[in-house]
Amino acid sequence: MTTTSATAVLNGLSSSFLTGGKKTQALLGAHVTARVTTPKRFVVAAAAVAPKKSWIPAVKSGGNLVDPEWLDGSLPGDFGFDPLGLGKDPAFLKWYREAELIHGRWAMAAVLGIFVGQAWSGIPWFEAGADPGAIAPFSFGSLLGTQLLLMGWVESKRWVDFFDNDSQSIDWATPWSKTAENFANFTGEQGYPGGKFFDPLALAGTLNNGVYVPDTEKLERLKLAEIKHSRLAMLAMLIFYFEAGQGKTPLGALGL
C-alpha cells in the first residue's frame, strides 16, 4: 500500500509541469488526509523481584557466609544461614530440609510432653519410666521393640520413599495406603501429605462434601509457621539437655 501511494505521488509530480500544479495539489492533499496507521508500542514491565532475606540483615557483604548462592529463598524459613555449606549439593539440601522437618516435629512433641508430663505427675522427664530397682533405669526389651523394630521399620520405609517417591505405597508394603483414601498424599509434596487423616482440622485445605481439597496459600503459610516453631523447639530441647545434666527440669529451672 505504501509503495502504491508513493508511486501515485511521484506520477502526479511529474505531470504537474503540464497541468499547472492542480493535479499535484490534489494528489498531495489526498495523500496527507489519508489515514495514517502508527505502529503499536508494547511496554514490557519487569516484575519486581523480592530481595532475599538474610540472617544478618545489617550486613550487605560477606560472600557465601552471609548470602549463600545455593540458597535462593524458595524454602520456607530460608534466611541464607548455611555457614558450613551443607546445602551446596541440591540432593543434600533436600535431605537436610527433610531431616530438619522431622527432627523439629519430634522436638515440638517432646517439649509439650515434658511440660505436661512433669506438671501432671511431678516426675522429671529424664526419670520418667525408670525402674529404681533395676540394673538399668529402663527395660531393654521395650527399648529394643520400640526403637529398633517399630521405629526402625517406619524410618527405613521413609528413607526408601525419600529417594524413590511413592515407592512404599504399594499394597504389599503398606496395605492401607492404596485402599484408604485418607492416607494418600493430597498436596503432592514430600513431608506434607495433608488429607483428612494428616490434616483433620483442614488447616491447610478445605473439605467439600467430605473431599479434602488442599489450599496452596494456607499450606505455604503453615509451612513457615511450622519450621519456625520446629527450630524453637529444637533449641529448647538442647537447653533441656543441659539442664538435665545439672539435675534440673525446665519447670525447676524456672522456679516452678
Swiss-Prot record:
Gene3D superfamilies: Chlorophyll a/b binding protein domain (1.10.3460.10). It is found in: Plastid, Chloroplast thylakoid membrane. GO terms for biological process: photosynthesis, light harvesting in photosystem I; response to light stimulus. GO terms for molecular function: chlorophyll binding. Residues 1-45 form a transit peptide. Its main location: plastid. The keyword Plastid applies. InterPro entries: Chloro_AB-bd_pln, Chloroa_b-bind. It holds the Pfam family Chloroa_b-bind. Keywords: Chlorophyll, Chloroplast, Chromophore, Membrane, Photosynthesis, Photosystem II, Plastid, Thylakoid, Transit peptide, Transmembrane, Transmembrane helix. The chain crosses the membrane at residues 106-126, 134-154. It is a multi-pass membrane protein. GO terms for cellular component: chloroplast thylakoid membrane; photosystem II. Belongs to the ELIP/psbS family. This is Chlorophyll a-b binding protein CP24 10B, chloroplastic. The lineage of its organism: Eukaryota, Viridiplantae, Streptophyta, Embryophyta, Tracheophyta.
